[in-house]
Regions:
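Cleavable N-terminal signal peptides
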Residues: 12, 23-25, 108
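Catalytic cores and adjacent binding grooves of peptidoglycan-active enzymes
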Residues: 49-55, 97-98, 114-232
Length: 235
């Protein structure tokens, strides 16, 4: 009887500790068994830079973007990813991006119609799914998510890109990262925000490069900023 009571108290203590550090049970998702989804394709390790629609990307990122386009278009998608580029890589000194676009592997995409500038709401989830399947950590940044009246767009970081800035890499597997089931945005209170678009999509090539489903795993280097990087000053 005493052992049963002690066990119950232990379980309750663990539950209280978990909720206190995560805010809710939603912040402690668990990984699912790995089954490689159809459409996975390992990008080439080509870091030659080129300009596309006024934005600079390396060829690895561009190949991933084009693969995502093919996946998305095959499902009836109507937006053009190259034409929709609003920010590329290697663009430092942009405060709103808090360093994520300073290196390679980062892209922002418009979700608006080129015809009438309306938000193409029905295209957003198919775009995100295709980008994630192609190897990006990708999320919708809705209006006002980053600062008052910040424009709606998709933000994507190429998993495994060797040119990633430290802040971009943190969005993949840092405290607030995609592979941990979160939205990639550092929070002043230190509590990660759950990914609104579901869990990460993994391919075998990502596992081969040691990128795993980290949901529910302890976070290394748990500094104030959530990674080895200091917490940036958000606008």
């Amino acid at each position: 009887m005493l052992r049963t009571i002690a066990l119950a108290l232990f379980v309750c203590t663990v539950l209280v500790f978990t909720l206190a550090h995560t805010g809710s049970a939603a912040y402690n998702p668990t990984p699912t068994p790995f089954v490689e989804p159809e459409g996975c394709w390992e990008p080439p390790a080509d870091y030659t830079r080129e300009w596309v629609n006024g934005q600079q990307l390396n060829k690895r990122t561009l190949a991933m973007l084009d693969h995502a386009q093919a996946l998305y278009s095959a499902q009836g998608g109507v937006l053009d990813f190259r034409l929709g580029l609003t920010q590329g890589s290697y663009t430092g000194a942009l405060a709103a991006s808090f360093g994520t676009h300073d290196g390679g592997g980062a892209v922002d995409l418009s979700v608006r119609s080129l015809g009438d500038f309306s938000i193409m709401t029905a295209e957003i989830e198919p775009m995100l799914h295709a980008l994630r399947l192609a190897g990006f950590a990708a999320w919708l940044r809705d209006t006002g998510d980053l600062y008052p009246n910040s424009p709606i767009h998709i933000h994507a970081i190429a998993i495994g890109d060797l040119d990633l800035s430290a802040m971009a890499r943190a969005q993949i597997d840092g405290t607030f990262g995609y592979l941990r089931g979160f939205d990639g945005l550092p929070q002043v209170d230190g509590i990660p925000q759950v990914d609104r678009h579901g869990g990460p999509i993994l391919c075998q090539w990502m596992l081969n490069q040691s990128f795993y489903d980290l949901r529910g795993q302890p976070v290394p280097f748990a500094t104030v900023g959530g990674t080895t990087q200091p917490l940036p000053k958000l606008p």
